[in-house]
Amino acid sequence: MQSEAGAAGAVHGSLQSGALTTTYTASQGLLLMIPNMYKMAGELLPGVFHVSARALAASSLSIFGDHQDVMATRQTGFALLAESGVQEVMDLSAVAHLSAIKGRVPFINFFDGFRTSHEIQKIELWLMMIWLN
């Protein structure tokens, strides 16, 4: 793919064919995906975008956490789900996927773009198993 715009097009096509599809991106990439996000939400395709939310900058060198990238997608029709820690990211990622499938609504699952995305922490898998049962 040349950019995240192409990746969003690939996700859209994959979802249309019935595959369970997700992608992971950060601030500038998310803004390039917005045109395809309108299509996915309008077609009620159950995709999930995991977003490492960072401040938008002229270059891609910003390490400051900010939600302006995610807030730019509010009007697309995607449901938003926010996490504040590594355990929450693990648990609510599964919730986002299950909710997208059950409700036929695409989700943006977002968290802090520098602290949480680079944090190393032991997680409890049994918490995620509760959601799957």
Show which residues each predicted segment covers:
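Conformationally flexible catalytic loops at phosphate/diphosphate-handling active centers
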Residues: 107-133
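Metal-ion/cofactor- or nucleotide/acyl-coenzyme-handling active-site neighborhoods
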Residues: 70-74, 121-124
